[in-house]
Amino acid sequence: MASPKGFFNYLTYFLAAGAVTLGIGFFALASALWFLICKRREIFQNSKFKAIDERCRQRPSMAKIKSHSQCVFISRNFHTGRFQLQEEQRKKEAAHIKAIKDHSKDEPQLATKNIICDPSETSSTTNRSSVTLSLSTLPSDSYYSQSIEAADDWFSDDSLVKRNSPMPSLGEPLMEKVFSYLSTISLEEGTESVLNDTL
């Protein structure tokens, strides 16, 4: 039988070996954890740098894609000139319509009547005068003129004296008669006569 002294020696030896192995194990575990923590930091930092690099790479690629799409659009328009011609025609038509609308707004709503009286040379036998009346209506853009031959009964003795004077001027009775005649003429008859003349 072994003595108890030898048993205690084996027990102490076994405990010392166990403590040494536990210490080595803890040291190995701590070093492994430290290694993993350092690697994790490196991996995290690398992932950040990679994400930043990818973003920086994507920005110029997007710019290239945009420039490429613009080039394709321009080249399509260059090869198909019809689209450009249609756009130019639409712009011209829109500008023309706008100019017409502005012009029609600037014009007065009522027609202006210009009365021009030109006495012609009178002969001793006929004793007649011609009065030319030109009427212009701006809103409808149709211009027409009418010439009226007035007989001697239009003029009174005073108007004949004034007509033979060196400075011819229109008297009040003449103007009244002209305006009374114009009031009898309807604008519809004038426009119909102008349309018949143009046709």
Curated annotation (Swiss-Prot):
Matching InterPro entries: DUF4718
UniProt topology in membrane: Single-pass membrane protein
Protein's UniProt keywords contain Ligase: no
A Gene Ontology term for the protein's cellular component: membrane
Keyword annotations: Membrane, Transmembrane, Transmembrane helix
Major location category of this protein: membrane
Coiled coil spans: none
Record keyword Membrane present: yes
Stretches that traverse the bilayer: 17-37
Compartments reported by the entry: Membrane
Name of the protein this chain belongs to: Uncharacterized protein C1orf185
Naturally occurring in which organism (per UniProt): Homo sapiens (Human)
Name of the coding gene: C1orf185
